[in-house]
């Protein structure tokens, strides 16, 4: 399951790492936009298999940030 950015912003912090167990609703990435920090949560429970962003990276709304299987 793809975890996508719900806003355009900058990756402020990565909360989970490849191989970590992730629960539904767990914050995987924190985005910063207009000086506000917004968590991007996993919609499913599983294991983080891919991380497609890095801290400080600018991302567009809809960009795939991570993958949980």
What label would you give each PLM region?
Residues 55-57:
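A cross-kingdom feature marking charged/low-complexity
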Residues 1, 13, 25, 30, ...:
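Secondary-structure boundary/capping motif
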Residues 1-10, 27-43:
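Short beta-strand-turn/beta-hairpin segments enriched in glycine/proline and small hydrophobics
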Residues 23-39, 60-69:
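Short hydrophobic beta/alpha edge segments that flank linear recognition/processing sites
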Residues 7, 12-21, 50-53:
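Short histidine-centered loop motifs in beta-beta connectors
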């Amino acid at each position: 399951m793809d975890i996508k950015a719900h806003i355009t912003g900058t990756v402020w912090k990565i909360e989970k790492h490849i191989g970590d167990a992730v629960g539904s609703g767990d914050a995987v990435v924190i985005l910063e936009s207009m000086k506000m920090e917004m968590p991007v949560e996993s919609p499913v429970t599983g294991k983080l298999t891919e991380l497609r962003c890095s801290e400080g990276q600018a991302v567009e709304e809809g960009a795939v940030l991570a993958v949980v299987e």
